[in-house]
Design a protein with these regions (language model features):
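Short secondary-structure boundary elements
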Residues: 4-232, 236-244
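Internal alpha-solenoid helical repeat scaffolds
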Residues: 244-263
Length: 263
């Protein structure tokens, strides 16, 4: 059904004026594509979860749009939307693959920084996915509407492609995050490199670069007294070192091993 018909249905279901339900109906339309079965399913789900509630004092249904935007979809609705991914343009599918590398959600600031680093129209493509109901854009984040949608996007890549994606995004983000002093994005960049692993390195000179980035990340974690995370960064840094690292990068190697031992 179209947006007008859906709004009429929602208004009648909640016994409210269509004017009062229009914003809610827009959210429902994005999440269900107007499928009547899923509209009813979603309204029931939100009512059961307390996101749609009957106010006895006001004598009408009420809801919190921000909480509804962040709520995950029921499994059957998510499966329906997952099948729609293949019908999207290649640019939008590519943007979903990129976002899926960062997990269930990513900050808009990170995505904008990655867009500048890669020189593409990532934000525009992700906004199309939001309009299609595959993503939610709220609380300064892009979030997959359901884990299955994130998994389907991630599974569009084979293992080697995933490693290359993780590595390239980490290498692209790290210098931008350093220049802008964004520690959160910097740590995310290093995490991407570690997800890729040493096997993703194609230029031998990058081994020491990534090891040094892990050294910096480990030091930041130690400053926050997160010694478990710090050890993980130092250990990952060591794994990126090449066989002759004691000869070629003695100071870097010594610092990584010493700090790992302290954790």
């Amino acid at each position: 059904m179209d947006e007008h018909t859906l709004n009429t249905m929602v208004a009648e279901t909640l016994c409210l004026s269509p004017r009062l339900t229009r914003a809610l109906s827009n959210i429902i339309y994005r999440k269900t594509k107007g499928n009547p079965l899923f509209v009813s399913r979603l309204i029931r789900s939100w009512s059961n979860d307390g996101l749609l509630r009957l106010s006895m004092s006001r004598g009408r249904w009420e809801w919190d749009e921000e909480k509804i935007l962040c709520q995950k979809l029921p499994d059957d609705v998510a499966e329906f939307l997952t099948r729609s991914i293949e019908k999207l343009s290649e640019d939008v599918k590519s943007s979903l693959r990129i976002l899926s590398c960062f997990g269930a959600a990513s900050s808009i600031a990170l995505i904008e920084m990655l867009e500048r680093a890669l020189g593409n129209n990532l934000v525009d493509s992700l906004d199309v996915a939001v309009a299609e109901g595959l993503l939610d854009k709220a609380d300064d984040q892009y979030r997959f509407s359901h884990d299955r949608i994130q998994e389907a996007s991630y599974n569009m890549m084979d293992f080697l492609d995933r490693c290359n994606y993780h590595f390239n995004y980490g290498m692209a983000l790290a210098p931008w995050a350093s220049r802008e002093g964004d520690d959160g994005v910097f740590l995310t960049a290093v995490n991407q490199l570690n997800l890729a692993g040493p096997e993703a390195v194609q230029d031998k000179s990058q081994n020491a670069v990534v090891a040094n980035l892990n050294l910096r990340a480990g030091k930041k974690a130690m400053e926050m007294s997160d010694f478990e995370a710090a050890y993980s960064y130092f250990d990952n840094g060591i794994s990126f070192l090449r066989k002759k690292h004691w000869k070629e990068h003695y100071t870097l190697s010594l610092e990584l091993f010493n700090l790992a031992a302290k954790c």
